Amino acid sequence: MASRLLRGVGALAAQALRRTARGAAVTRSMASGGGVPTDEEQATGLEREIMIAAQKGLDPYNMLPPKAASGTKEDPNLVPSISNKRIVGCICEEDNCTVIWFWLHKGESQRCPNCGTHYKLVPHQMAH
């Protein structure tokens, strides 16, 4: 009995709060305010910065996978780094379940010790 009473009182209170001075109930809809904001309108801070960069075709925080090249000596896979060396993992074959890790140093392109794919270290500046 008490739960029915409280539920009814809550509904009446909600209706009273929605009424304006003229007595008409105020309704709020997504269409009246312009609809649901898009991701671009709602994003702030770092998320907004990343979205703007993505629209320009940039990847300031290296979130996307690197673009694979042919891996030959003339066209090596470019590996961005802020230092003079970086550790690189090569899967070698598409269905391989192990990763071959090796150090890549600044300068000439270097080969994966297992499959022979070439990688080259390129300087990268941080976005800050």
Swiss-Prot record:
Q: Name the residues that bind Zn(2+).
A: 90, 92, 112, 115
Q: In which pathway does it act?
A: Energy metabolism; oxidative phosphorylation
Q: Tell me which Pfam families the record gives.
A: COX5B
Sorted keywords for this record are: Acetylation, Membrane, Metal-binding, Mitochondrion, Mitochondrion inner membrane, Transit peptide, Zinc
- InterPro entries according to UniProt: Cyt_c_oxidase_su5b, Cyt_c_oxidase_su5b_sf
* Any single biological process term in GO: mitochondrial electron transport, cytochrome c to oxygen
Q: Which Gene3D superfamilies match?
A: Cytochrome c oxidase, subunit Vb
- Residues that bear N6-acetyllysine: 67, 85, 120
Q: Which SUPFAM superfamilies match?
A: Rubredoxin-like
User: What subcellular locations does the record give?
Assistant: Mitochondrion inner membrane
Q: One cellular component GO annotation, for this chain's record?
A: mitochondrial inner membrane
PROSITE patterns to which the protein is assigned, alphabetical: COX5B_1, COX5B_2
- Example GO molecular function term? metal ion binding
- Topology with respect to the bilayer: Peripheral membrane protein
Q: Quote the transit peptide annotation as a residue range.
A: 1-30
Query: What is its quaternary makeup?
Result: Component of the cytochrome c oxidase (complex IV, CIV), a multisubunit enzyme composed of 14 subunits. The complex is composed of a catalytic core of 3 subunits MT-CO1, MT-CO2 and MT-CO3, encoded in the mitochondrial DNA, and 11 supernumerary subunits COX4I, COX5A, COX5B, COX6A, COX6B, COX6C, COX7A, COX7B, COX7C, COX8 and NDUFA4, which are encoded in the nuclear genome.
Give the protein family.
Belongs to the cytochrome c oxidase subunit 5B family.
Matching PANTHER family? CYTOCHROME C OXIDASE SUBUNIT 5B, MITOCHONDRIAL
Chain's role: Component of the cytochrome c oxidase, the last enzyme in the mitochondrial electron transport chain which drives oxidative phosphorylation. The respiratory chain contains 3 multisubunit complexes succinate dehydrogenase (complex II, CII), ubiquinol-cytochrome c oxidoreductase (cytochrome b-c1 complex, complex III, CIII) and cytochrome c oxidase (complex IV, CIV), that cooperate to transfer electrons derived from NADH and succinate to molecular oxygen, creating an electrochemical gradient over the inner membrane that drives transmembrane transport and the ATP synthase.
From the Swiss-Prot or TrEMBL record, give the protein name: Cytochrome c oxidase subunit 5B, mitochondrial
